[in-house]
């Protein structure tokens, strides 16, 4: 029981470390990363590269998906270019998984020590937030070492071996489990690193680990769809298109697991490296196959989620309250200010219409103005709720 609790604590530490890095990077460099994406979508190849770079820094393809989705929702980026960014984002998170699979545990004490010093001594500055990122990196490396130590002991238990053996006979169960873990951890990177560490320490068979990796990739696509479920139609189109790519990847790579073990395993004796390289291969293959399909998938998504059907209600919806900007308070406040201007435009329309109603006694226009009044109330509530979600600790 003690070793199981140690393992669960290490997994929680890994997830928390990933969260610290993601939020810290977005708070310090969020505006710069958004500018990088917006400037690099002129063609699909630079869009892929920008997605790789941003996700390698943020360590979360879901965060990149939220940023790109908000751009599409505001009409700043076309859907095909946004889908190309997401293909690069998935490759970027795979590259970071390869980096973290290396034995970098010796850097953990250094990162944590320097991070704590910077975070405490320069608390409300950008340097202090960089310290928060270093703490997150240190915790991730520490967690990976603790997971290795815990699983080495746990795998000696007959009960654990029996439970793990139940996974080896059902590939669909492995994919489902990996997807659920990615959604619960809010990070496919953390799930893949956990899986690779377990495989490297003998906690799970390698073929099971590869099935979990396939599921983790599918789970990251589902997570982005779920995160943007309440957003406008244009914003929801990007995660849905990326989910199509993930499903294609599952269809392509699942039958190749056996070939991977047969032809690659002799050259990569370390199981952890074998798992993260398969994760990289998964997203690289998806990127190469799907880079030419971004336009086709974009059209399919637009047919599934047509904008015209919801155009009538568009005026009452917030246009500028970007959820991905919440991690960067300065951007979030700018979004709220723009939405307040949108609200003011609606009020101006009401006042102009009021003069006409007084002069002409137009009952239909009067009814439209009553609806505009409801829109103003809805926008006010949305702005107020959005402002409450801005992280106070990131404000200075």
List the model feature ranges, each with a label.
Residues 50, 84-87, 135, 177-180, ...:
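Internal alpha-helical transmembrane segments of multi-pass membrane proteins, especially GPCRs
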Residues 95, 217, 221-222, 243-252, ...:
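Hydrophobic transmembrane alpha-helical segments of multi-pass transport and channel proteins
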Residues 3-15, 98, 134-138, 204-214, ...:
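Alpha-helical transmembrane segments
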Residues 55-58, 67-94, 98-107, 115-119, ...:
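Membrane-interfacial helix-loop connectors
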Residues 5-58, 62-67, 124-199, 267, ...:
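Membrane-embedded alpha-helical segments and adjacent helix-loop junctions characteristic
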Residues 18-27, 68-73, 114-128, 224-231:
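C-terminal ends of transmembrane helices
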Residues 77, 103-104, 204, 230-236, ...:
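Cytosolic, long alpha-helical scaffolding segments
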Residues 81-87, 106-111, 128-139, 239-244:
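Cytoplasmic-side transmembrane-helix entry/capping segments in multi-pass membrane proteins
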């Amino acid at each position: 029981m003690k070793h199981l609790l140690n393992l669960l604590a290490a997994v929680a530490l890994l997830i928390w470390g990933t969260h610290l890095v993601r939020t810290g990077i977005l708070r310090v460099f969020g505006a710069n990363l958004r500018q990088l994406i917006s400037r690099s979508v002129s063609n699909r190849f630079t869009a892929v590269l920008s997605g790789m770079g941003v996700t390698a820094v943020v360590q979360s393809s879901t965060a990149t998906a939220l940023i790109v989705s908000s751009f599409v929702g505001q009409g700043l980026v076309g859907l095909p270019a946004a889908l190309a960014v997401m293909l690069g984002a998935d490759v970027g998170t795979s590259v970071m998984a390869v980096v973290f699979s290396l034995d970098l545990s010796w850097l953990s004490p250094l990162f944590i020590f320097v991070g704590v010093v910077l975070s405490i001594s320069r608390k409300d500055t950008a340097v202090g937030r960089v310290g928060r990122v270093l703490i997150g990196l240190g915790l991730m490396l520490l967690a990976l070492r603790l997971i290795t130590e815990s699983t080495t002991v746990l795998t000696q238990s007959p009960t654990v071996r029996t439970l793990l053996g139940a996974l080896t006979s059902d590939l669909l169960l492995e994919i489902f489990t990996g997807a659920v873990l990615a959604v619960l951890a809010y990070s496919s990177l953390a799930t893949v690193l956990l899986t690779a560490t377990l495989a490297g320490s003998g906690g799970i068979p390698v073929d099971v680990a590869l099935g979990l990796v396939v599921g983790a990739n599918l789970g990251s696509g589902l997570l982005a769809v779920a995160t943007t479920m309440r957003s406008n139609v244009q914003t929801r189109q990007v995660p849905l298109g990326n989910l199509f790519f993930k499903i294609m990847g599952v269809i392509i790579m699942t039958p190749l697991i056996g070939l991977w073990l047969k032809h690659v395993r002799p050259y990569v004796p370390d199981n952890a490296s074998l798992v993260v390289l398969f994760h990289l291969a998964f997203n690289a293959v998806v990127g190469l196959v799907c880079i030419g399909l971004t336009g086709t998938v974009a059209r399919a998504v637009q047919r599934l989620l047509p904008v015209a059907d919801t155009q009538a209600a568009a005026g009452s919806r917030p246009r500028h309250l970007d959820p991905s900007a919440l991690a960067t308070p300065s951007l979030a406040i700018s979004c709220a200010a723009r939405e307040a201007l949108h609200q003011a435009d609606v009020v101006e329309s009401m006042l102009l219409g009021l003069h006409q109603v007084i002069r002409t006694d137009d009952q239909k226009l009067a009814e439209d103005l009553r609806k505009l009044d409801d829109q103003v109330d809805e926008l006010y509530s949305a702005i107020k709720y959005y402002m409450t979600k801005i992280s106070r600790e990131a404000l200075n």
